[in-house]
Amino acid sequence: MSLSGLRKQFNKANQYLSETMGAAEPTKLDDVFNEMEKNVDTTYNLITDLVAGTNEYLQPNPATRAKMATQVALSKVRGTTKTSPYPQTEGMLADVMQKYGQQLGDNSDLGKSLNDAAETYRQMADIKYQMEDNVKQNFLDPLTHLQNNELKDVNHHRTKLKGRRLDYDCKKRQQRRDDEMIQAEEKLEESKRLAEMSMFNVLSNDVEQISQLRALIEAQLDFHRQTAQCLENLQQQLGHRIKDAAARPREEHVPLSVLANESRTPRSSFRSPAPSDMSHNSTAAAAFKMPPQNGGGITQAPPSYQGPPPGGLPPPLSQQQKPQCRALFDFDAQSEGELDFKEGTLIELVSQIDENWYEGRVNGKTGLFPVTYVQVLVPLK
């Protein structure tokens, strides 16, 4: 910098300090110019915040945005241009649905429905990528161009105007020669005119900026139209899936026993008499009568068999007086101290342990068994 230029910068700094301290009064610009400056500052801040807000709307995850910015920086350092796209939430949801739809398989109606939904959400993710490209091309790029070019030129003229105004006020305060004052005044007027015209051009371009805002709305509207159509198609597909699943006959399922393929626990060697044996013994016993009390001989009744009474054979008289129950199901003892029996077995009740277990006796063997497996014939006293 030359000596004259250094002196000029020193004079400007001196004038600025004097104005700040209140020792000098700056040259006032007209109200129209001041209002235009205010509107330009507002426009600059508007574009800065609007671009940031739009990017956050398109890519809402800040951690992912930071990661992508780091990848872009590393790609520039390495000299590569390969970058991964922003992971859309619709695409991530589609991956989850497809994963479990494949695990359930084509035999599952739910699995096929999940695959249908995954395909639809993947289409929605592609549509959102198209919306991002559209918004970037027709909204973000024009705003960024306005900020980096027109507004940058406006601020350049404003900065130059401020410097020439300080130079003019400094020479005016120092009462320089007329030719220097005239030259400083001409430069001040020129800078003020350039700055004002550049601000006017930016502020009078509302039509273009409104058109850019409309492009943003149109891109969003087109996105929602296409995604709504995709969801309506998916809704119809799932309706058909529901009808097919409801029309299919319901399959019956019988659970397999845990011990179906294993040998059961060996039973006691004692075998309870078969119903036919019990019937034969009862018939044989009924063929004889006790001798009369007057000492007469034994009389034999003619053998006859009337068959078992309805509902099965009644227990002997001695058993009817004792608390007893009849087994409703087979019960296999699972631990020591339990009493196993077959369906229809008569069990002598010894005691009730609690609300879930009885203690009983069968063929001289005593043990525990569940209450729900038997029907009480003669209750405990």
Swiss-Prot record:
May form a homodimer (via the BAR domain). Residues 1-21 are annotated as: Membrane-binding amphipathic helix. One of its GO terms (biological process) is clathrin-dependent endocytosis. InterPro entries: AH/BAR_dom_sf (IPR027267), BAR_dom (IPR004148), Endophilin_A_SH3 (IPR035824), Endophilin_SH3RF (IPR050384), SH3-like_dom_sf (IPR036028), SH3_domain (IPR001452). The lineage of its organism: Eukaryota, Metazoa, Ecdysozoa, Nematoda, Chromadorea. One of its GO terms (cellular component) is membrane. Belongs to the endophilin family. Residues 170-238 form a coiled coil. Gene3D superfamilies: Arfaptin homology (AH) domain/BAR domain, SH3 Domains. Involved in synaptic vesicle (SV) recycling in neurons probably by regulating clathrin-mediated endocytosis. By controlling SV endocytosis, regulates the rate of excitatory postsynaptic currents (EPSCs) at neuromuscular junctions and thus locomotion. In a similar manner, involved in necrotic neuronal cell death induced by abnormal hyperactivation of ion channels. Plays a minor role in responses to mechanical stimuli. Plays a minor role in unc-26/synaptojanin localization to synapses. An N-terminal amphipathic helix, the BAR domain and a second amphipathic helix inserted into helix 1 of the BAR domain (N-BAR domain) induce membrane curvature and bind curved membranes. The BAR domain dimer forms a rigid crescent shaped bundle of helices with the pair of second amphipathic helices protruding towards the membrane-binding surface. Essential for synaptic vesicle endocytosis. Plays a role in unc-57 localization to synaptic vesicles. The SH3 domain is required for unc-26/synaptojanin localization to synapses but is dispensable for endocytosis and unc-57 targeting to synaptic vesicles. Residues 320-379 form the SH3 domain. This is Endophilin-A homolog. Residues 305-317 have a biased composition (Pro residues). It is found in: Synapse; Cytoplasmic vesicle, Secretory vesicle, Synaptic vesicle; Membrane. Expressed in neurons and posterior intestine. Residues 246-323 are annotated as: Disordered. It holds the Pfam family BAR. Its main location: other. PROSITE patterns: BAR (PS51021), SH3 (PS50002). Residues 18-247 form the BAR domain.
